[in-house]
Amino acid sequence: MKIAIAGGSIAGLACALTLTCTGHDVHVYERSAGPLRGRGGGVVVLRQMLRFLEQHGHRTRAMLAVPTHRRRWIDIDGNVTRDDPELLPFSSWDAVYRSLCSMLPPASLHHGRSVASVAEDADGVEIRFDDGAAPVRADILIAADGTGSRLRSALFPGNASSYAGYIAWRGVVSENAFNRVEVADLIENMTLYRSDAELFMTFLIPALNGSLDTGMRRFNWLWYRNEPDESSIGAFLTGRDGHRHHASVPPGELSEQSLAYLHRAALDGLPRALSQLVAATHAPFLQAISDALSPSFAKGRIALVGDAACTLRPHTGSGTSKSADDAVSLAEALATISGKDVVQVLDRWAAMRRGAVAPLLLKGPRLAQSFGLGYPST
């Protein structure tokens, strides 16, 4: 079958790869003008995805991870208050993204193509683009266009993401930016700090080129802070060029006012071991934490995956792995069907996936509230 994917981030690329592996003609349409390299931080290794790719002849060494060995909590003075053994393998968003791109036929990736509208009939879907390019027909369209999905809004009018009451300041900074003594306690551990209405965590991820060598790796950090005033969120989401972003501001695009706020808050409110990470980060970025859940993960010949289907709180550590599970399960569901069975198969797949993520949708807000983050439950 011919399958079109709207959105070329990890969820869209993962679907493109699994569906290509199972014999479909797949094309990805990404609105950004070029590749999205360097736009994310750490991610948990996608074990199910790796198994699937290896079964289909792809080497996945580029998704290697830095293991953390302990989960350590510290206080404002840097003293360890809790220290538990825990092995967690972390890769990086850009390493996973680059690896997925490298395994896809270059001709299947189309940048600078934003889907404007779709029209479905009994035989397929016609896709129109904002730039006025010739429409494309496909047997199936996969919406992988993120938390603020335009396609989800078109399919289910009135359905929108809802702000959860807190934000995540984020960044990555090279391990070799520091004297090794200064960061010795942060290396190969997950280090966390909690105070009223905020939570900071950091861990190592591979270098931008995928290297795991000591000194070449990067610290990934996340700082969750309550920001219940939505007018403040609007200011933070307004980038240096005056553009108001929907839910996140990419690296290098924070306004001078937001950067000044971040640096002052880190200096005043974080342990020295952690504030130095923030101060040394050249291009921090921002994510407003939101909840989104599509009424269904499919409608007709259109399927929704990744954050377009539902947005999980980052505390679950499941956002990227959910995208991988979406991709693998969808490829398996579509592996042997005929064109006439598409709608029924997508309906069954959608019900299965929605049921699978239901526990994670409940877990995220509970974890946030246990840290004092977000709006209280009603």
For each feature predicted by the language model, list its residue ranges.
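Extreme N-terminal starter segment of soluble prokaryotic enzymes
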Residues: 1-3
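Conserved mid-domain beta->alpha element of the FAD-binding
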Residues: 7-21, 25, 142-143, 169, ...
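Conserved Rossmann-like nucleotide-cofactor binding loop
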Residues: 11, 34, 148
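Glycine-rich FAD pyrophosphate-binding loop
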Residues: 20-39
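Active-site-adjacent segment of FAD-dependent monooxygenases/related oxidoreductases
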Residues: 33-103, 371
